[in-house]
Amino acid sequence: NEAPFIQTANATVYYPEQAQGSTRKYPIIYVQGEINEQQQKVLVSQFHQMVDENKTWPAVLCFVKANTDLSETISDIEKQLSGIRGSQRMRALITLGDNIKEGIEAIQGENLFTGIVCVNAIGNENDAQNLIKAVNSYKRYPRCWIEILPESKEYGFSSNIHILLKESDLEHEFRSRKCKEANVFTYWEDWILYLNNRIHV
């Protein structure tokens, strides 16, 4: 039973199974990075299983193409599509690799997200400083989860974000764990549970 989805220029949007024939509006989790269609379907299926097991709220999952303007995509998606509760308390972000730069630009723009997960982030010292400044400027701080492979050559960057968040006394999670069979989404459920606890339905 495949999840209903909508393809736009820069994103693929999957609705919860409960959304069919419903007028209810749902929170939305944006995921940006190199994720093929097969991976998306696996992640959506895992997410729906978590919903069925009452581990998480039903939500819209929006997979945004890598290296596209995230702020613009969010604006387009939430204007064009129905069934989305577009507010900071209902919006979260998972960003992979060098897409953290698009993430930072979106975070800087306005109070967009209630929670942010950065996975194997690629960036420099400026990016780290910009991320901290951006989340610090929020009226309501979006909690951050930083996930990095222990052997990653970008370990220093994620570690730097962790240190800066700690120095700013901003509550966050920092994880450095090996992935199973090179699957970057090994800890997908952990990230969803973390964001679920931030979303206020």
Residue ranges and their predicted role:
Residues G115-H200:
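The feature captures the conserved acid-bearing segment of alpha/beta-hydrolase catalytic domains
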Residues T95-I100, N120:
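Catalytic nucleophile serine of serine hydrolases
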